[in-house]
Design a protein with these regions (language model features):
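Generic N-terminal initiation segments characterized by hydrophobic and/or small/turn-forming residues
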Residues: 1-2, 19-21, 28
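Cleavable N-terminal export/targeting peptides
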Residues: 1-15
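Generic detector of low-complexity/intrinsically disordered segments
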Residues: 3-7, 24, 402
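Hydrophobic alpha-helical elements and their junctions with loops/disorder across both membrane
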Residues: 5-6, 51, 271
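Long, low-complexity, intrinsically disordered polar/charged segments
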Residues: 10, 191-193, 197-240
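Outer membrane beta-barrel
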Residues: 27-213, 281-325, 332-334, 338-345
Length: 402
């Protein structure tokens, strides 16, 4: 149905017997009730990954158990009531262990302020807070291993004309138990000293401190080398059974001018242990992209709910560029260097560095094809018992979202 919509465009809003208006377009299915009543929108996404990888060292396991897999298969629903209430629920049919993503309710009655309760992303890391629909590559950087991502909690956010602040308290994830992972306090502040239609300069600082319960599952940190299809991780701390707290500090910077965008982050993580000294890990990335025949990514200061403030949105395909209108679509080139250091003292989780180059093609609205090449170097690698691992990976994605 949605591919057909991409070809034909949005349907005309239809008036229902009770006065409701039903619209089907690139944003999904929207039902609007009259007289300042609620608005219900149903959308979703499908991400299909395919690829191949080779390891340069002999004697290591096959990198991909299969060469094609569904990365995400979401259905999403959003309910707005006047200017005071936002409700969101997202369910991923491709993730049996953690199918619930956002499940939150937000009060929006105060000016420029959001109060949100539910399962949502903690306000940490620009890369993590950008929507899965709009990430530059198929996967986020190696440093995303440190991002707390989604948990259940309470977040308070506020923004001005060029700045944002979000503070929050979180427990565990709604899928695995709200009390199993302790309690975290997470906050993020951003400023955009340059913010015009042509250029944006973004600066951000985030911090998170999580107290871990003694009966919690052991803490571990790892990364799948920027490709979902990998069977095993190249770097992995394994179980840190005596961890008592985990603290994270993140620095962000990004600059967009016209179709060019450069973005970087550095994250440092410290794990306190009972009966042993603390462990320190670090990671970061720098990435750049250039839209070859279209507009650059827009800067979105405030979300509809939650704490995903000050992020870059996806690519907009102009009407004349749509393949269904005789155009060629929009093309975007991208490159990234990322690094992750999980070595400290006697804990040898490994050090990995990746270089990625990619091409994104947006043939029409709500459709994207991604082609990435990733060159990975891990030395030492937890996968190879402390030896070096080098990998060459091609990963592609077909993405449909509405």
């Amino acid at each position: 149905m949605l591919v057909g919509l991409a070809r034909a465009g949005a349907t005309e809003p239809s008036r229902q017997p009770g006065g409701e208006t039903l619209t089907i377009d690139g944003k999904g299915i929207t039902l609007t009730f009259p007289e300042d009543g609620p608005t219900l929108r149903i959308g979703g996404k499908l991400q299909l990954d395919y690829g191949a990888a080779s390891l340069r060292q002999a004697g290591l396991p096959e990198p991909f158990p299969e060469n094609i897999a569904v990365r995400r298969s979401w259905i999403e629903s959003y309910l707005s009531y006047g200017k005071v209430l936002e409700v969101a629920f997202q369910y991923d049919f491709a993730e049996p262990r953690r199918p619930i993503n956002d499940a939150a309710v937000a009060y929006t009655g105060f000016a420029n302020t959001l109060i949100t309760l539910g399962n949502m992303k903690e306000p940490f890391s620009l890369d993590q807070l950008i929507s899965d629909n709009a990430t530059l590559f198929t996967e986020r950087s190696l440093a995303d291993a440190f991002a707390p991502a989604r948990n259940f909690g309470l977040a308070l956010g506020h923004h001005g004309t060029d700045w944002t602040v979000a503070a929050s308290v979180f427990g565990g994830n709604a899928n695995t138990g709200l009390t199993r992972e302790g309690v975290a306090a997470t906050a993020r502040v951003t400023t955009a000293p340059i913010r015009t239609d042509e250029a944006v300069l973004h600066l951000g600082l985030a911090g998170s401190l999580r107290d871990l319960p003694r009966d919690a599952a052991p803490l571990s940190l790892s990364s799948r080398s920027e490709a979902f299809l990998f069977r095993q991780t190249f770097v992995d701390t394994g179980d840190i059974r005596d961890a008592t707290t985990i603290a994270r500090l993140g620095l962000e910077a990004a600059y967009r001018t016209g179709p060019f965008l450069v973005q970087a982050e550095y994250i440092r993580t410290r794990v306190e242990r009972s009966g042993a000294g603390p462990l320190s890990f670090q990671g970061g990335y720098i990435q750049a992209s250039l839209v070859l025949n279209g507009q650059g990514r827009a800067y979105k200061l405030a979300p509809d709910y939650g704490a995903t403030y000050a992020v870059f949105a996806g690519i907009v395909v102009p009407e004349a560029a749509r393949v269904t209108r005789g155009g060629l679509g929009v093309f975007e080139l991208a490159t990234r260097f990322s690094a992750l250091d999980l070595d400290d003292g006697s804990l040898r989780g490994g050090i990995e560095r990746d270089v990625t180059v990619g091409l994104n093609w947006y043939p029409d609205r709500n459709i994207r094809f991604v082609a990435d090449y990733v060159r990975s170097h891990a030395s030492p690698s937890a996968l190879a018992g402390g030896r070096t691992v080098d990998a060459d990976t091609f990963i592609g994605r077909f993405q449909l979202y509405w």
